[in-house]
Amino acid sequence: MGQKIHPHGLRLGITSEWRSRWYADKQYADYLAEDIKIRDFLSEGLDRAGIANVVIERTHDRVRVDIHTARPGIVIGRRGSEADRIRGQLEKLTGKQVQLNILEVKNIDANAQLVAQSIAEQLTNRVAFRRAMRKAIQGAMRQPQVKGIKVVCSGRLGGAEMGRTERYHEGRVPLHTLRAEIDYGTYEAHTTFGRIGVKVWIYKGDVVGGRRESLMNARDERPSRGRRERPRRGGARRQRAEQKQEG
């Protein structure tokens, strides 16, 4: 089941959190339909902004929308004009007061949704699919919190007559382990040969006792501002001579 089910849905309440945070009794269906419309509007209107996640919170008369994006300048616009336009459209869509928060995603290579979108954009620009997949894998594995990544592309790859699926992975991606923090993202590339689907799984370590291994690794592996020590050069003869002098 771990190979087929959505990694976020399988781990809700364990390693992943809900992306819609509100409670409703009789209005549940209306609120859910509104959430779907909000997400569709943002994904279609801000496809160039690199949206990684949209979190929606509701109160009785207010809707709070948190947009996690790699390019906040596109979402905000000049002097906040684009953000005001988006807020107005969302208020017209929901009929309620909307609080819009725009949050920047700093580590792009460790976010599965942004990695999938990057691969899809390269495929749209006629970059070879193998090169795009390998470049994404190399960029992700350089991050200290990433322990494994799997990338899948499906469609008429390279303009072939028959569609097929290509898979590349590096490191560990334990989809059956519930305590594993798995980030998952999908995107579609619209090419001249048709649509190509891109799926990305990124493993960032385990979550034990509420502590995320990915956060601990990111803190430990921060580069120091001081000068790095160069490795000493020399063969076995020099090492033996130094050992004799010490002895």
Curated annotation (Swiss-Prot):
> What InterPro entries does the annotation carry?
KH_dom, KH_dom-like_a/b, KH_dom_type_2, KH_sf_prok-type, Ribosomal_S3_C_sf, Ribosomal_uS3_bac-typ, Ribosomal_uS3_C, Ribosomal_uS3_CS
**Keywords per UniProt:** Ribonucleoprotein, Ribosomal protein, RNA-binding, rRNA-binding
Any transmembrane segments, and where?
none
- Cystine links in this protein are none
Biased amino acid composition, Basic residues: 227-238
Residues annotated as domain KH type-2: 38-106
Check the record and name the Pfam families matching this protein: KH_2 (PF07650), Ribosomal_S3_C (PF00189)
GO MF annotation list = mRNA binding; rRNA binding; structural constituent of ribosome
What CDD domains would the database entry show? KH-II_30S_S3
Q: Where is this region: Disordered?
A: 214-247
The reply on keyword rRNA-binding is: yes
Q: Which GO terms describe its cellular component?
A: cytosolic small ribosomal subunit
Gene Ontology biological process terms in this record: translation
Q: Compositional bias (Basic and acidic residues) spans?
A: 214-226
Q: How does it assemble?
A: Part of the 30S ribosomal subunit. Forms a tight complex with proteins S10 and S14.
What family is reported? Answer: Belongs to the universal ribosomal protein uS3 family.
Per the entry, what this protein does is: Binds the lower part of the 30S subunit head. Binds mRNA in the 70S ribosome, positioning it for translation.
Which protein are we looking at?
A: Small ribosomal subunit protein uS3
